[in-house]
């Protein structure tokens, strides 16, 4: 672990696919030194300070050493998976082009919130399987000037006309209606959430943050091999609408190949409208009119009144401690409480005895995640409609009891794991990106369409691919 001082911050970005870690140590910096990283499948940002703060975290292979010594070692490590260092800021996302957009915003004088907004819109163009303006998510930020951690909740909401029986068969089982097609879409929250974050904490003009995404949609993006491949296996879902087929496949039905340019003219129009009119353009303007018209034609549920009623919400973060550090994450309906539960369970084990990447280490993590996710399935929900036993789920005593279920030489079977009863401890396909700037601001964003390519339904004339969150 990089030693934390009053003038240094260590930021760990963990790629859960390649297990790479990116570390930034804040010291007196040279201007113009920005770091961007792309092609990160999933990113989670861990922040250590003497005062201690954290957005999202997964940790296991932490060692000791000074910041300067660590940085020198990191710079010399000859691997594409080695940690990367940036002195003025860092942007990590799943797509290199979107990461470049964020780094450019930082270089233009924007802060981490500005860059996070720009990356969010850029990913809607460059990573349409998960990046979005038709989905939802959570933004967790440390605002350096105010010395506070805050959460922007832009989770989607069910349309007023939605009824449970619409999504169930005669046996009461969920049908594909909740996953594919226009009825699967909940009211999107991304545009409202990004605007709220910008209004509260951004610096640069709103339109400046959306301009890069608009240009990418208008001029086209050259597809990588991975992106071209993903359109192939997502083809069946994207048959849910003629607009999606027309946007992502050629006239003869064939897919775009790696190296070919994908132009999204309708999406460019939508982004331009949002740049000029803000979230109002999306929820109350011509975009809203087009959403309602297509919903009516295709049998969907979202109306203009649903869109006009939507609000993103700024919330207090959920927090706990891990080995002396305070950890902050998004509250329900996010899965942040599950992260805290897992860390509390891990706190009952001496991790220094485990070799990183060893069978024993992987076993411990797998069993911990099984326990945490079993409770997530049983107990988590939207606190506006359900009572979630938060205090119990993040209780140290509850975690200690759950940790006793882990057998060091035996893997548990999923069917054998039952949810615990955290109430006894009470009193009375998605993408992630992270941004840090030279001012000490830190932003962690997880947003999604639900499944890869969401519902597969695209609103005619807008390029907006909709989520399938009604299956949640």
Segments predicted by a language model, with ranges:
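Noncatalytic scaffold domains of N-terminal-nucleophile
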Residues: 70-100, 104, 112-113, 117-277, ...
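Short hydrophobic targeting helices and cationic amphipathic motifs
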Residues: 13-14, 19, 34
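Short alpha-helix boundary/capping segments
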Residues: 1-8
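Cysteine-centered motifs
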Residues: 16, 22-25, 61
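Internal maturation/activation junctions in enzymes
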Residues: 349-448, 462, 469-470
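Bacterial N-terminal signal peptides that target proteins for export
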Residues: 37-54
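A short, polar/charged loop-to-alpha-helix boundary motif
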Residues: 452-467
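Bacterial N-terminal signal peptides
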Residues: 51-63
């Amino acid at each position: 672990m990089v030693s934390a001082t009053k003038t240094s911050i260590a930021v760990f970005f963990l790629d859960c696919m390649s297990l790479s870690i990116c570390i930034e140590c804040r010291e007196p910096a040279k201007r113009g030194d920005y770091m961007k990283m792309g092609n990160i499948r999933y990113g989670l940002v861990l922040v250590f300070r003497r005062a201690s703060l954290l957005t999202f975290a997964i940790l296991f292979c932490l060692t000791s050493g000074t910041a300067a010594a660590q940085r020198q070692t990191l710079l010399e490590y000859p691997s594409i998976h080695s940690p990367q260092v940036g002195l003025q800021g860092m942007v990590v996302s799943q797509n290199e082009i979107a990461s470049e957009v964020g780094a450019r915003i930082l270089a233009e004088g924007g802060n981490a919130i500005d860059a996070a907004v720009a990356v969010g819109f850029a990913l809607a163009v460059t990573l349409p399987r998960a990046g979005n303006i038709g989905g939802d998510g959570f933004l967790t930020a440390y605002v350096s000037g105010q010395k506070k951690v805050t959460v922007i909740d832009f989770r989607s909401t069910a349309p007023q006309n939605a009824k449970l029986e619409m999504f169930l068969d005669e046996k009461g089982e969920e049908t594909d209606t909740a996953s594919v097609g226009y009825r699967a879409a909940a009211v999107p929250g991304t545009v409202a959430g990004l605007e709220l974050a910008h209004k509260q904490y951004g610096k640069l003009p709103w339109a400046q943050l959306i301009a890069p995404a608009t240009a990418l949609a208008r001029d086209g993006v050259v597809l990588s091999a991975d992106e071209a491949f993903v359109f192939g296996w997502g083809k069946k879902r994207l048959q849910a609408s003629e607009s999606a087929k027309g946007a992502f496949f050629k006239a003869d039905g064939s897919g775009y190949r790696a190296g070919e340019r994908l132009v999204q003219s309708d999406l460019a129009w939508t982004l331009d409208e949002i740049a000029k009119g803000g979230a109002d353009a999306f929820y109350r303007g011509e975009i809203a009119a087009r959403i309602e018209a297509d919903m009516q034609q295709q049998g969907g549920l979202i109306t203009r009144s649903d869109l006009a009623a939507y609000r993103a919400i700024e919330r207090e973060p959920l927090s706990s401690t891990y080995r002396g550090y305070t950890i902050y994450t998004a509250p329900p309906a996010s899965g942040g409480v599950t992260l805290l539960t897992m860390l509390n369970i891990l706190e009952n084990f001496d991790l220094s005895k485990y070799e990183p990447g060893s069978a024993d280490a992987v076993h411990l993590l797998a069993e911990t995640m099984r326990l945490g996710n079993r409770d997530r399935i049983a107990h988590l929900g939207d606190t506006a409609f359900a009572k979630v036993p938060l205090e119990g789920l993040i209780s140290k005593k509850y975690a200690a009891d759950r940790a006793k279920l882990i057998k060091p030489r035996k893997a548990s079977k999923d069917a054998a794991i039952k949810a615990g009863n955290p109430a006894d401890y009470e009193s009375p396909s998605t993408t992630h990106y992270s941004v840090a700037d030279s001012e000490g601001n830190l932003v962690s964003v997880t947003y999604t369409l639900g499944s890869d390519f969401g519902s597969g339904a695209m609103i005619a004339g807008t390029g907006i691919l909709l989520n399938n969150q009604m299956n949640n």
